[in-house]
Amino acid sequence: MDNYEFSELLKTLKNKVGNIASIIKPENIQTRLKEIEELENSPSFWSDVKQAGIIGKEKTKITNLLKNYENAFNALNDASELFDLANSENDTETLEALFNDAPKLEDTITSLEISMLLSGENDGKNAIVSIHPGAGGTESNDWASILYRMYLRFCEREGFKVETLDFQEGEEAGLKDVSFLVKGENAYGYLKAENGIHRLVRTSPFDSAGRRHTSFSSVMVSPELDDDIEIEIEEKDIRIDYYRASGAGGQHVNKTESAVRITHFPTGIVVQCQNDRSQHKNKATAFKMLKSRLYELELMKQQDSANAGEKSEIGWGHQIRSYVLFPYQQVKDNRSGEAFSQVDNILDGDIKKMIEGVLIALKAE
């Protein structure tokens, strides 16, 4: 990097921060935080626990947004002032240090962009994730289990907690179906970008001839709904089946039919839960999963309508990403257009940067 490239980078980043400031209006956030502080000091505030909880979540969200904005604004100002000073004094050592820190400065601005993009109504919610293998038997089942591990590692990296709701092992390898709840700040905001079809190209470990195989798995992500959001489900529209649970490695195998499957006829959505030994609890969780899926489906319909009939880029039926392990190694996202060569790292859960690229690309459209 040289002086010209760094000065152009500063201009680009200043424009970004300026645009973000005009959207989030930091002064309005500060005013709102003062209002919340006054509310919290009122003796009657804590008498309504539910409302206090809602305002508490709002406070956390806008405090983080303001903090990210101030960090980005200050880092950019400091870099700009230091750059001007180093240039005037022909201080090559300081200039070199600024050039080396340029990626870190870009990451700070990206962090601000992402916190702004994750300010939607549902982004802060927990996420319910389901992975279903496509046609192809063992190949697809194995691919689904690789994706499952990738998301578990991602959650581990981000400090998200994971609760398995349903797990069905494949007959020879991998899994037939898995659903899990991801708990943590902005879990849905990040993972909603994973909605869609994931394609794998590799030399099959199950093919003695070592031929190249293509496998598909679908990932479905929906927000865990608060109890106060009402989704009407009519009894005539569903079928409830009960069966014996059979978890991974024989875990929680029950002699009673505690596992629950609900089929929703109008949409074709099927949800299953065998997380608990109690049929009653599994049924309640399965209904919660169904409501979340129906809610997500409605969000997609609204998005399609808002786009005047254009296809939504976050949808259960769209191929969103290709993972090629042979004849070369590359992961390419169809929405951001970005390609990554660190395939092993990605399959080990290092997907945050890739997801952020998708969120930024979709916002720019």
Swiss-Prot record:
Keywords: Cytoplasm, Methylation, Protein biosynthesis
PTM annotation (N5-methylglutamine): residues: Q251
Gene: prfB
UniProt xrefs under Gene3D superfamilies: 3.30.160.20, 3.30.70.1660, Release factor
Function per UniProt: Peptide chain release factor 2 directs the termination of translation in response to the peptide chain termination codons UGA and UAA.
Source domain of life: Bacteria
Any one GO MF annotation of this record: translation release factor activity, codon specific
Entry's localization field: Cytoplasm
Database matches in InterPro entries: PCRF (IPR005139), Pep_chain_release_fac_I (IPR000352), Pep_chain_release_fac_I_sf (IPR045853), PrfB (IPR004374)
Record keyword Cytoplasm present: yes
Keyword Mitochondrion recorded: no
PANTHER family in alphabetical order: CLASS I PEPTIDE CHAIN RELEASE FACTOR, PEPTIDE CHAIN RELEASE FACTOR 2
Name by which UniProt lists this protein: Peptide chain release factor 2
